Swiss-Prot record:
Residues 12-75 form the S5 DRBM domain. Belongs to the universal ribosomal protein uS5 family. It comes from the Bacteria. Pfam families: Ribosomal_S5 (PF00333), Ribosomal_S5_C (PF03719). With S4 and S12 plays an important role in translational accuracy. SUPFAM superfamilies: dsRNA-binding domain-like, Ribosomal protein S5 domain 2-like. Keywords: Acetylation, Ribonucleoprotein, Ribosomal protein, RNA-binding, rRNA-binding. Part of the 30S ribosomal subunit. Contacts proteins S4 and S8. This is Small ribosomal subunit protein uS5. GO terms for molecular function: rRNA binding; structural constituent of ribosome.
Length: 166
């Protein structure tokens, strides 16, 4: 699993999570192609992921990066950590993420770590259960981050004060 990181002029951090060779069987044999899974973020709560497929690795990575920039979401962070513990699943992959105190760092594995790093989360405890397929882990992590809301937003929706919610 590659963990390549680049900073672009737009201020986005780009990470390559996975490159995979796939084959299409045709009458004359096999046609090989490559798929790429990437995550892109600004380190301040905006994060996106993308998948690309092409005959050559660089082209697949480029397509994945473009898809990731189009698929960005805003995550409500509590400083450098998450708002509250959260669980999420996609397919057979289940992820659990919980906020951590300052100085803890990112305690997460593989694909989940890449997503949290580019999102700007610096202190978190995370665990992946079930399938560790990077594609499903990234989807599950995104679901968890997307569904997380700041207490202020929840209070505003309910028409109550933050103190009443907490």
């Amino acid at each position: 699993m590659a963990n390549n990181e680049q900073k672009r002029d737009e201020g986005y951090i780009e990470k390559l999570v996975q490159v995979n060779r796939v084959a299409k069987t045709v009458k004359g044999g096999r046609i090989f192609a490559f798929t790429a899974l990437t995550v892109v973020g600004d380190g301040k709560g905006r994060v996106g992921f993308g998948r690309g497929k092409a005959r050559e690795v660089p082209a697949a990575i480029q397509k994945a990066m473009e898809a990731a920039r189009r698929n960005m979401i805003q995550v409500d962070l509590n400083g450098t950590t998450l708002q509250y513990p959260t669980k999420s699943a996609h397919g057979a992959s289940k992820v659990y993420m919980q906020p951590a105190s300052e100085g803890t760092g990112i305690i997460a594995g593989g694909a989940m770590r890449a997503v949290l790093e580019v999102a700007g989360v610096q202190n978190v405890l995370a665990k992946c259960y079930g399938s560790t397929n990077p594609v499903n882990v990234v989807y599950a992590t995104f679901k968890g981050l997307k569904n997380m809301q700041a207490p202020e937003a929840v209070a505003a929706k309910r028409g109550k004060s933050v103190e009443e919610i907490l």
